[in-house]
Amino acid sequence: MASGTHAHEKYWPVIEAFFDYYGLVGQHLDSFNRFVREELQQVVDSVGKLTPKIEGYVVELGDIEIGKPTIREADGSEHDLTPNEARIRNLTYASKLFLNMTPVRKEGSVSTRLETLKVYIGNMPIMLRSEKCHLHGKSDDDLIRMGDDPKDHGGYFIINGSERV
């Protein structure tokens, strides 16, 4: 039994190197980034177009756009929303989702594409330290200045001010 234990010791450097590189949340961040960067658009592309109840029209679905979290204040001003502010103010750390939509009018065999519209379709919670997070790529000094812990690797969401996995 003791020799079996020693045989496994040679694997620990590989395991430690994996966690040093990815951390405990690396897979969560990679998965979320892939979802935002590729898979969300693939869902839109698979739908392709909508047929409204208005005869002679279809709506072609285009690119989806996701920015970094912002907040609009009561006075109408808008600014970047940081995770720390979301926690303190009991807000959801989320980004606005926009979808480019092009109405197409069909009259007989003639189709006329109208002006493409950038349409707000909702908000999406943003995973902390993902590519869409304001903390992504920041130095330790910047993180401290923003009110966040440099040792916090992210991989979770802030919903109504509470951290959720």
What do the predicted segments below correspond to?
Residues M1-V165:
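Conserved N-terminal architectural modules of multi-subunit, DNA-dependent RNA polymerase core subunits
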